[in-house]
C-alpha cells in the first residue's frame, strides 16, 4: 500500500487534535488556572457607635436627653506593635440630637483608645463641636438654654468600655464642650451617657 506525504501529514494532524483532550484529562494541572489571591476589600470605617446621654444635669438644660451616633475611621498608620499603636488616634465624626429641643451638635476630631486588658479599655477624644444652641449674652438667653458664647466649641470626651466579643462592646462616657474663655459667655455643656459599639 502506497502512502503519499500529504495523506501522512493529514493523519498525524488528526491524531494530535484527537489526543489533546485526552492528554489534558490525564494531566490535572493543565485544567487548573493559575492562582490569583482574592481581592481584599478596603474598609475605611473602623467602628460604629450609638447611644444616649443626659444633657448637662447641673445646668439650664437639665432633665433633657440626647441620642448620639458616632463613626470612627481606620487609623492612618498601621503595622505598629500594640503599645505604640495606642498613640495613633482614629479620626472620628459624630452627632448628638437633643430630643427635648435644647442644644444639638455635630463634632469631629480624634479618638485615642488604650487597652487595660483584652476586654477593658479606656479612651479619650479631642476635637471641635458645632452646635445650634444659644450664643448671645446670658441676659438674652432663655432660661431653659445654656449660653454657650460661640460656635464651634472645643470638645473633649472620655470613656471606659468593655468588649463583649470581637465585634461588640459597651461604654460609659462623659463629654464636655466649651470655648475655653475665648468668647464672652462660656457656660459650656457637660453630658453623661453610654454607648454600644460595633467594630468592623
Predicted segment positions?
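Cleavable N-terminal export/targeting peptides
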Residues: 1-40
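Residue-level signature of outer-membrane beta-barrel architecture
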Residues: 71-75, 112-114, 162, 176, ...
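Outer-membrane beta-barrel "beta-signal"
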Residues: 65-69, 189-200
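Solvent-exposed loop/turn segments connecting transmembrane beta-strands
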Residues: 56-64, 95-106, 116-118, 130, ...
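Membrane-embedded beta-strand positions of outer-membrane beta-barrel proteins
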Residues: 48-52, 91-95, 122-126, 156-160, ...
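Outer-membrane beta-barrel translocator/channel fold
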Residues: 55, 123-157, 161
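Short coil turns and loop connectors of transmembrane beta-barrels in diderm outer membranes
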Residues: 44, 87, 102, 116-118, ...
Amino acid at each position: 500500500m502506497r502512502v503519499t506525504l500529504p495523506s501522512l501529514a493529514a493523519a498525524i494532524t488528526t491524531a494530535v487534535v484527537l489526543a489533546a483532550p485526552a492528554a489534558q484529562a490525564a494531566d490535572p494541572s493543565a485544567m487548573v488556572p493559575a492562582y490569583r489571591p482574592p481581592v481584599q476589600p478596603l474598609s475605611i470605617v473602623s467602628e460604629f457607635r450609638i447611644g444616649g446621654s443626659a444633657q448637662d444635669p447641673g445646668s439650664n438644660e437639665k432633665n433633657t436627653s440626647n441620642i448620639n451616633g458616632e463613626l470612627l475611621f481606620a487609623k492612618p498608620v498601621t503595622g505598629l506593635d500594640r503599645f505604640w499603636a495606642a498613640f495613633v488616634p482614629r479620626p472620628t465624626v459624630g452627632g448628638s440630637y437633643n430630643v427635648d429641643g435644647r442644644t444639638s451638635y455635630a463634632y469631629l476630631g480624634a479618638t485615642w483608645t488604650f487597652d487595660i486588658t483584652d476586654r477593658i479599655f479606656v479612651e479619650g477624644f479631642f476635637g471641635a463641636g458645632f452646635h445650634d444652641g444659644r450664643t448671645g449674652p446670658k441676659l438674652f438667653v432663655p432660661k431653659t438654654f445654656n449660653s454657650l458664647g460661640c460656635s464651634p466649641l472645643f470638645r473633649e470626651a472620655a470613656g471606659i468600655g468593655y468588649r463583649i466579643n470581637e465585634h461588640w462592646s459597651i461604654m460609659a462616657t462623659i463629654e464636655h464642650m466649651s470655648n475655653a474663655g475665648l468668647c464672652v459667655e462660656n457656660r459650656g455643656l457637660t453630658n453623661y451617657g453610654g454607648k454600644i459599639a460595633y467594630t468592623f
